[in-house]
Amino acid sequence: MDWKEILRRRLATPSTSPHKKKSEQELKDEEMDLFTKYYSEWKGGRKNTNEFYKTIPRFYYRLPAEDEVLLQKLREESRAVFLQRKSRELLDNEELQNLWFLLDKHQTPPMIGEEAMINYENFLKVGEKAGPKCKQFFTAKVFAKLLHTDSYGRISIMQFFNYVMRKVWLHQTRIGLSLYDVAGQGYLRESDLENYILELIPTLPQLDGLEKSFYSFYVCTAVRKFFFFLDPLRTGKIKIQDILACSFLDDLLELRDEELSKESQETNWFSAPSALRVYGQYLNLDKDHNGMLSKEELSRYGTATMTNVFLDRVFQECLTYDGEMDYKTYLDFVLALENRKEPAALQYIFKLLDIENKGYLNVFSLNYFFRAIQELMKIHGQDPVSFQDVKDEIFDMVKPKDPLKISLQDLINSNQGDTVTTILIDLNGFWTYENREALVANDNENSTDLDDT
């Protein structure tokens, strides 16, 4: 082709051009095709470098249905074998005694008082001699955790041994609880925890005096504490990890001590005296002996000075049967009122105080409940206190983020939630708060008189 022809084609108009000019849409389509081509090549190159990218890993395992009996049995057996293997990996009593002997043999002088110490070099020597089961405890991380202010860079042998004992106990307990985890997903339902505690009762000497007819009420009393505090969303299940992390299991297993003091038993919710006290109160309130509590019967709880407005809210919000409360619902009520400083208890009471269901308390809510306190004061021949004064005191105590609203988190953060709720629901509690200075003065006078005698 000569240069004349080339020039003619170059100068040709669109209508006479042998190649049509591409439209904007065609250019976009071509660009997308090129992008897809090059992106696919690049992505394909990545796939070739790592076989893992070719498949999506499985992250969901369906639980066997009720009619899939064989699959259920297979799952149960495999879990049982797995838990048995984990149990065999733990230190037994003989191995723990051997560990103590090795630690005592390799202690590093000088002693601090009567406390034996060990340095890092001897610590590693014991780890080598103690066997493979102990390997996880003899790490630099564990040593550093227990290292405090010793000038020789040593740790306490007793503290380390207690650490090992605690770890072994936690693993043993986790395995024990997992045996009752029917679903095998790391949590216990209410019925699972009931079975665990029921089978635990014979191993607790402090519960030997309980009659078997009371076992069901005891189990209900014990289980409610776990679920009230560890299941705030009321899902009906608790993580095994949460059970191990809280102190409730320690309190329950404390009942293994045959010489547990009377004071410890009185303050332990799981003790026989405590369970009998709570159930006895329930029976005393149940005047018509129908096994349930009406609003009138519940009004006699404690000092019998709770307001009718608050009790109305209890029966509106809590689960009742024909307008009456059963023992399980009563336990939640008792746990909330006896532990008002705890977030779970404050959440329970806050829900009752939040009459508009807005997630916060405003002046209207406070006035609604305090009016009932003022009415009770009149009935008892006392001069009613001004609501404005009480309202200002409450907001000063709580110091909410919003100056016109008090949220549940505000109550928890203020550490005054127990005082605020008591002022609003219980005349005796309000009177105690109002006369707190006089009561403190009387206590001081009484203590002075005792000192003089």
From Swiss-Prot:
Subcellular location: Nucleus; Cytoplasm
UniProt entry keywords in alphabetical sequence: Calcium, Cytoplasm, Metal-binding, Nucleus, Repeat
One Pfam match: EF-hand_13
PROSITE patterns: EF_HAND_1
SUPFAM superfamilies given in the database record: EF-hand
GO cellular component, one term: nucleus
UniProt: Ca(2+) binding residues: D286, D288, N290, M292, E297
Residue span, EF-hand domain: 273-308, 341-376
GO biological process: B cell homeostasis; cortical cytoskeleton organization; microtubule cytoskeleton organization; positive regulation of B cell differentiation; regulation of dephosphorylation; T cell homeostasis
Quaternary structure note: Interacts with MCM3AP/GANP, PPP5C, and the phosphatase 2A core enzyme composed of the PPP2CA catalytic subunit and the constant regulatory subunit PPP2R1A. Finds in a complex with ABCB1, TFPI2 and PPP2R3C; leading to the dephosphorylation of ABCB1.
Function: May regulate MCM3AP phosphorylation through phosphatase recruitment. May act as a negative regulator of ABCB1 expression and function through the dephosphorylation of ABCB1 by TFPI2/PPP2R3C complex. May play a role in the activation-induced cell death of B-cells.
Protein name: Serine/threonine-protein phosphatase 2A regulatory subunit B'' subunit gamma
Originating species: Bos taurus
Top-level taxonomy: Eukaryota, Metazoa, Chordata, Craniata, Vertebrata
